[in-house]
Amino acid sequence: MVATCLQVVGFVTSFVGWIGIIVTTSTNDWVVTCSYTIPTCRKMDELGSKGLWADCVMATGLYHCKPLVDILILPGYVQACRALMIAASVLGLPAILLLLTVLPCIRMGHEPGVAKYRRAQLAGVLLILLALCAIVATIWFPVCAHREITIVSFGYSLYAGWIGAVMCLVGGCVIVCCSGDAQSFGENRFYYSSGSSSPTHAKSAHV
């Protein structure tokens, strides 16, 4: 029962974290920047934001973004962070699909428990890997951006990335380390049997 609960907790935590990583990858409010001194920017109410895909200017009543489309002149850290965040977002899809197939309520034919266990371990490893990719990108980007322009604060995209990466890391560790062994996955299977009166559900027994 404990292993089953941990599997569900790991899945939910990882799924929410993966959504946070996708939000971070697709938005541009990574860091809030200032082209002048910070007091001047606050007085003029003119701040900017910088992300993986665009540089934006936020003035009174205006919001304008310049897409970063020229790959040849982009700083290396921007391109590297793009690759890391895209990899994290893509790795999340097979990880979540694998976790769906190992949930206690899902059964795929008469497969042994060891098959579910191996899929769960693979999903957990993928989650840990994508979390590490996101952590590296969301730390590397603001550090390098600070060398180019004054950073006023971190944006919501960066916070979403940190939270999402930590949740995926926790979810992956729970799946790999705490969700039971191959035998527990086998014991969590259910079968459907039809009787003369009404259908019943019973837990499979192994000798």
Swiss-Prot record:
GO cellular component entries: axon; basal part of cell; bicellular tight junction; lipid droplet; myelin sheath; neurofilament; plasma membrane; tight junction
Membrane topology designation: Multi-pass membrane protein
Domain of life: Eukaryota
Cytoplasmic face of the membrane: 1, 104-122, 179-207
GO BP field: axon ensheathment; calcium-independent cell-cell adhesion via plasma membrane cell-adhesion molecules; cell adhesion; spermatogenesis; tight junction assembly
Compartment annotation: Cell junction, Tight junction; Cell membrane
Protein keywords: Cell junction, Cell membrane, Membrane, Phosphoprotein, Tight junction, Transmembrane, Transmembrane helix
Broad class of the protein's primary localization: other
Residues that span the membrane, as ranges: 2-22, 83-103, 123-143, 158-178
Residue numbers bearing the Phosphoserine modification: 193-194, 197-198
Stretches assigned to the Extracellular side: 23-82, 144-157
GO molecular function: identical protein binding; structural molecule activity
InterPro entries xrefs: Claudin, Claudin11, Claudin_CS, PMP22/EMP/MP20/Claudin
Described purpose of this protein according to its UniProt entry: Plays a major role in tight junction-specific obliteration of the intercellular space, through calcium-independent cell-adhesion activity.
Subunit structure: Interacts with tetraspanin-3/TSPAN3. Interacts with OCLN.
Sequence similarity: Belongs to the claudin family.
Protein name: Claudin-11
Native species: Mus musculus (Mouse)
